[in-house]
């Protein structure tokens, strides 16, 4: 198995993709709006991917957060609120906010499970800081670590109840970055003591099964490389101070925060300690280069993948009725907001 997650170019596999994926055997896939038509189509696509690899439990992920980050959209799928709504509700009624976040995540997870998606890149555990770039903004669960951890745990629990594994991101924290890492490399100059705030939610949820790295440079830890490419940050901070021993996924290697060829980025991420290299844009030359650049997957990474997918369920019972009940409960709680 190749230690990579690849994107697909369109709503069905091309002949070239099918041949390449069969031979390369990537650990999994990430889906975007370009891959999505409707429920029947999306289930057929994910079933095709499972059949191609002969793996019933296949890592198939998506960024389905709610708000401005949603790949599955109305009118086929329901709209979900941005995660920041639960932060706002927490100001008024913390227990209600936690319940609403859990119900929302379970309903959203049912949408994913019934079309064969096993992993959602949610929740964000980034602690939002004043003056940061708005790339996180209302996607965040708040600006206070205990709150972010409590709501993040509720999101993970809700997704798990639906048979979907959540991904905590962007470790070790994107909440104070002054630039959008899609466009440039953010450099955070906060001290190690100040960064304890950023680490706190990740430490609280260090037993999460999957985490995604931040393409952010933290001068207090390593002023030479962003976290994704820093062996020091991954060993000392992610695996060390945070205590995370789950599956570590890079953020998209095609983002402008990183330099070098895509293959070089993948090799550097793996050498730094990322279990899986994420490449979203389905450019065949890049994917072939990544396959050639990556070292064979180690036993520890393979075991982490197995643990991450062990409780996934792509045949949720009573999905429609459960989703209706869950969204009604969420909406009743969010109605408390002024």
Predicted regions and their residues:
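Charge-biased, low-complexity intrinsically disordered regions
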Residues: 41-51, 107-108, 117, 320
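Glycine-rich, aromatic-flanked loop segments that form ligand/cofactor-binding clefts
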Residues: 53-81, 101-128, 148, 156-172
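Preference for extracellular/luminal or secreted protein segments
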Residues: 1-24, 260-338
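Second-shell residues forming the walls of enzyme active-site clefts
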Residues: 35-52, 58, 70, 153-154, ...
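Divalent metal-dependent hydrolysis catalytic cores, especially in the metallo-beta-lactamase
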Residues: 28-34, 118-124, 274-277
């Amino acid at each position: 198995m190749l230690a990579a997650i690849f994107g697909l170019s369109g709503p069905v596999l091309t002949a070239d993709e099918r041949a390449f994926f069969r031979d390369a055997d990537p650990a999994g896939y990430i889906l975007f709006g370009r891959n999505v038509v409707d429920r029947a189509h999306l289930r057929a696509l994910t079933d095709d991917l499972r059949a191609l690899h002969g793996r019933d439990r296949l890592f198939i992920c998506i960024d389905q957060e709610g708000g401005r980050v949603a790949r599955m959209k109305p009118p086929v799928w329901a709209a979900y609120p941005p995660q920041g709504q639960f932060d706002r509700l927490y100001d008024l009624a913390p227990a209600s906010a936690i319940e609403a976040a859990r119900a929302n995540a379970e309903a959203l997870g049912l949408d994913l499970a019934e079309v064969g998606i096993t992993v959602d890149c949610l929740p964000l555990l980034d602690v939002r800081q004043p003056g940061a770039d708005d790339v996180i903004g209302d996607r965040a669960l708040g600006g206070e670590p205990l709150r972010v951890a409590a709501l993040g745990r509720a999101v993970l629990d809700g997704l798990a109840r639906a048979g979907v594994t959540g991904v905590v991101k962007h470790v070790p924290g994107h909440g104070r970055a002054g630039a959008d890492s899609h466009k440039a490399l953010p450099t955070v100059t906060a001290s190690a003591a100040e960064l304890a705030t950023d680490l706190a939610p990740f430490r609280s949820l260090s037993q999460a099964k999957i985490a995604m790295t931040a393409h952010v440079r933290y001068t207090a830890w390593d002023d030479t490389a962003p976290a994704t490419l820093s062996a020091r940050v991954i060993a000392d901070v992610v695996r060390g101070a945070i205590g995370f021993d789950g599956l570590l996924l890079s953020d998209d290697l095609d983002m402008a925060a990183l330099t070098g060829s895509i293959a070089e980025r993948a090799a550097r991420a793996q050498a730094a300690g990322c279990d899986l290299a994420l490449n979203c844009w389905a450019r065949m030359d890049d994917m072939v280069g990544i396959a050639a650049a990556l070292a064979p997957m180690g036993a520890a990474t393979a075991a982490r993948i197995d643990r991450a997918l062990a409780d996934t369920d792509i045949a949720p019972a009573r999905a429609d009725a459960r989703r209706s009940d869950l969204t009604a409960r969420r909406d009743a709680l969010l109605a408390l907001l002024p």
